[in-house]
């Protein structure tokens, strides 16, 4: 082989090796440096970044909402409010929901369904004339809003008999201190055992007491303002409200005189209040009053002055439940009222009305159930109501306006928020027109 051939062969080998080395080196360098960056479109990048920020903000909002719902569900952050503290503010358990919230919206409610069965005959043996009735009696929603630790809005909207809507109360509270506050709006008159505490899981019996229907006409609410407070074991409420619309009074009681907040006539105002003492948990007793004119300009110089006073008490201890109330109402200018309305004989408005009741119950499961467990409470109730206790001179009373009620029944609470009540009521009066009843009530509160 010639020298030239040898040199050409070696040159070709060197060139081939160099090319192979270059080809292998370029991909390795490319892998080490990554892909060649592409110059971004500035418009597209801005839109994508804005969309990403919006999605992140939405995700944060969803997370916050989920946390808030979980907090509400679990009750985390609620303010502790004992039964005694709620009662001192005139609040039944469900109505107190807004006062347990730290801030913001609260929703609660209650309802009841009532079956009423009537005897075939009256006390004197004549036909009863009434057929059984099954009523979606009440469905209520409480809506409240705590603006801060001082200001609170509390409202109750009620549907009665499945079709009648009412604003039961609506007021704004200002808590000046922990133990004293101001209240204004459509207020529950602070009288008796039931008017402020009318939830079916609270009062005993399938129906509210007749004394707190005819004389203290619950649920009784009027427009006004006032104060409330509690010191140690004493609590009070004192309001000024519009007076009754007395032209609706009758021989059957004062119930028709309620104005319920609807364009209430306020020529006559009234003062109402109560004071209660709670010596030990589960026990309280006190008195309440109402005083004001009721004519609202319809009787000339007469103002149809109306005064109602009651004494009441409740003892719940070791499974026993004792409740009692006595109420008396006095009406001035009854003669002027009767003449103006052409009422004669036994149809006239009385100068004095009175009524009272005693309820005794015992939870037979109290010694075996834990707190918040099932409760089964048989009870008896004795009640007397007289809407013509004293008549003006020249008028006589009706024998049917003095009624005695004897009731025996039971209530069963599988949980504190649900109650089933069953009772039988015997009704008698001097007119022998009493008609016995058998009632069943299903109630709830939340």
Q: Could you tell me what each predicted segment is?
A:
Residues 1-13:
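N-terminal secretory signal peptides that target proteins for export/translocation
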Residues 16-27:
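Bacterial N-terminal signal peptides
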Residues 248, 253-298:
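Loop-centered beta-sheet repeat module
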Residues 49, 170-175, 195, 203, ...:
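Outer-membrane beta-barrel pore domains
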Residues 30-112:
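N-terminal periplasmic/intermembrane-space "pro-region" immediately following the signal or transit peptide
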Residues 93-124, 128-247, 267-285, 350, ...:
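Outer membrane beta-barrel
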């Amino acid at each position: 082989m010639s020298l030239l051939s040898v040199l050409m062969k070696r040159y070709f080998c060197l060139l081939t090796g160099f090319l192979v080395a270059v080809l292998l080196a370029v991909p390795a360098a490319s892998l080490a440096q990554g892909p060649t960056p592409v110059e971004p479109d500035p418009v597209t990048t801005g839109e994508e970044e804005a969309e990403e920020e919006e999605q992140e903000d939405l995700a944060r909002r969803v997370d916050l909402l989920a946390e808030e719902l979980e907090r509400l569900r679990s009750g985390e952050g609620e303010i502790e409010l004992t039964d005694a503290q709620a009662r001192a503010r005139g609040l039944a358990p469900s109505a107190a929901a807004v006062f347990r919230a730290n801030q913001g919206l609260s929703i609660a409610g209650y309802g009841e369904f009532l079956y009423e069965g009537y005897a075939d005959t009256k006390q004197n043996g004549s036909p009863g004339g009434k057929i059984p009735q099954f009523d979606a009696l009440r469905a209520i929603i409480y809506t409240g809003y705590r603006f801060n630790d001082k200001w609170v809005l509390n409202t109750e909207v009620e549907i009665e008999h499945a079709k009648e809507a009412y604003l039961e109360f609506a007021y704004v509270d200002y808590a000046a201190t922990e133990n004293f506050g101001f209240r204004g709006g459509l207020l529950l008159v602070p009288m008796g055992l039931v008017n402020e505490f009318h939830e079916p899981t609270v009062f005993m019996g399938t129906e509210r007491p007749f004394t707190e229907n005819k004389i203290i006409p619950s649920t009784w609410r009027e427009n006004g303002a006032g104060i409330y407070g509690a010191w140690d074991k004493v609590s009070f409420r004192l309001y000024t409200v519009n007076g009754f619309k007395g032209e609706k009074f009758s021989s059957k009681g004062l119930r028709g005189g309620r104005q319920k907040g609807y364009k209430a006539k306020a020529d006559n105002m009234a003062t109402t209040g109560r004071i209660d003492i709670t010596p030990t948990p589960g026990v309280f007793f006190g008195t309440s009053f109402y005083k004001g004119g009721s004519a609202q300009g319809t009787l000339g110089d007469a103002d149809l002055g109306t005064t109602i006073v009651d004494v009441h008490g409740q003892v719940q201890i070791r499974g026993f439940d004792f409740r009692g109330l006595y109420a008396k109402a006095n009406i001035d200018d009854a003669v002027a009222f009767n003449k103006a309305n052409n009422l004669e004989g036994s149809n006239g408005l009385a100068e004095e009305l009175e009524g009272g009741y005693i309820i005794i119950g015992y939870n037979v499961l109290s010694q075996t159930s834990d707190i918040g467990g099932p409760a089964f409470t048989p009870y008896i109730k004795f009640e007397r109501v007289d809407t013509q206790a004293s008549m003006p001179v020249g008028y006589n009373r009706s024998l049917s306006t003095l009624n005695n009620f004897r009731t025996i029944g039971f209530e069963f609470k599988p949980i504190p928020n649900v109650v089933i009540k069953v009772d039988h009521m015997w009704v008698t009066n001097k007119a022998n027109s009493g008609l016995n009843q058998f009632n069943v009530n299903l109630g709830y509160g939340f």
